[in-house]
């Protein structure tokens, strides 16, 4: 892992607008790194500096919100540098999980410093690993990133007994990660900023330790874990109940709790693909403009129906992402544009895909309906301004700016 990668590709949450980048940040490293201990004292009598992360609100499904965190550059550099200096030991620790599908893997061509979990690979592993098992336990951790106890970082890396005996920064690098994580969160011991890849790395450190603890207590762990989302397989109901108790205890040891609203006990085989996913994935748009127009209307009717039937699923988000792969006839652009703008009222999360389509067809020279876009997005902005919804406001303004549409005063 290179420090520049964590700064350029892993600092800002991916949900931020394209104009916000950290591409120039590595240029300050020659000046900052030699004086890092002066700028951010970690020893001696100098006063310690702490900073707060900036909150950026994004939508979740069913109207819920999530606050992403953008740390102060100095303390992000400090934490990222500590991670890079100990990258080999971190990789060794994180390689010990046999269930994770969200390893801290890097790739030079990736848009992020840490690769996202592969959905296709996860589905394949679920099928293979569930073979011969009768029961499935689905669990995830309640408010995971915001409830991580930073003192548990050295526990995960060095064991709790060792960490409590040696608490100073320079004795174990887990203590340094603990201290650096607190500095960018106003000195708090609970919570990591959601969005930066440093939080992904630290969360995986803790979760791998939990995976190891479960295996130690059960003798085996069969299943998959995607970040904090577990699918665990058992042969008997007794084994399932034992596994359930063990994971509760393992999480409690790290000051974490299960999300009881999402805990499910199911008999296998499991339905791998929801009906909406399969139907939308296989949907094809015909080339002739009149047939294609019918297909567009059918597609949106189908998607809206499924979105209302499965309000807890990302139906609209997946559907809008699929539109990227079709070149629509210019005669159908007006109706497609209207249907996309209407869909925003149901699910604001689709804004990036709506933006991609609107801006993409605008650059291709399509005759977009500026007045309709202006009216729809201005009303959208007014509505979300009253709610202080950062994501919706900034994305809608970005679309208008990219399309060179002036907003009303």
Regions found by a protein language model. Name each.
Residues 11, 219-220, 256:
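Short aromatic/hydrophobic-glycine micro-motifs
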Residues 67, 71, 222-224, 257:
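Short, surface-exposed helix-loop/turn micro-motifs enriched in polar/charged residues
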């Amino acid at each position: 892992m290179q420090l520049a990668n964590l700064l350029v590709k892993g600092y800002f949450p991916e949900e931020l607008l394209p104009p916000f980048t950290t591409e120039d940040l590595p240029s300050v490293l020659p000046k900052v790194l030699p004086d890092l201990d002066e700028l951010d004292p970690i020893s001696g009598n100098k006063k310690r500096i702490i900073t707060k992360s900036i909150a950026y609100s994004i939508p979740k499904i069913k109207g819920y919100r999530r606050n992403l965190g953008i740390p102060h550059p100095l303390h992000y550099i400090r934490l990222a540098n500590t991670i890079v200096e100990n990258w080999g030991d971190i990789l060794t620790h994180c390689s010990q999980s046999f269930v994770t599908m969200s390893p801290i893997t890097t790739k030079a061509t990736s848009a992020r410093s840490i690769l996202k979990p592969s959905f296709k690979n996860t589905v394949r592993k679920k099928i293979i690993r569930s073979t011969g098992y009768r029961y499935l336990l689905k669990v995830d951790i309640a408010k995971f990133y915001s409830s991580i106890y930073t003192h548990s970082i050295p526990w995960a890396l060095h064991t709790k007994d060792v960490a409590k005996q040696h608490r100073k920064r320079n004795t174990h690098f887990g203590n340094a990660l603990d201290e650096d994580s607190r500095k960018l969160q106003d000195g708090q011991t609970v919570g990591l900023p959601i969005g930066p890849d440093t939080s992904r790395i630290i969360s995986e450190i803790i979760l791998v330790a939990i995976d190891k603890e479960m295996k130690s207590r059960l003798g085996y762990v069969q299943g998959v874990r995607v970040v904090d989302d577990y699918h665990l397989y058992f042969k008997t109901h007794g084994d399932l109940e034992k596994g359930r108790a063990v994971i509760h205890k393992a999480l409690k040891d790290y000051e974490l709790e299960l999300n009881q609203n999402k805990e499910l006990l199911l008999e296998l085989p499991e339905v791998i693909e929801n009906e909406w996913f399969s139907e939308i994935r296989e949907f094809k748009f015909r080339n002739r403009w009149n047939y294609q127009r019918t297909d567009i209307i059918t597609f949106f009717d189908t998607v809206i129906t499924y979105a209302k039937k499965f309000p807890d699923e990302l139906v609209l988000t997946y559907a809008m992402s699929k539109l990227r792969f079709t070149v629509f006839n210019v005669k159908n652009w007006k109706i497609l544009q209207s249907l996309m703008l209407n869909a925003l009222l149901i699910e604001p999360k689709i804004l990036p895909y709506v933006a991609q389509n609107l801006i993409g067809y605008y650059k291709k020279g399509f005759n977009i309906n500026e007045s309709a876009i202006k009216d729809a997005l201005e009303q959208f902005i007014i509505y979300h301004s009253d709610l202080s919804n950062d994501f919706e406001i900034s994305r809608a303004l970005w679309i208008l700016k990219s399309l060179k549409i002036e907003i009303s005063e």
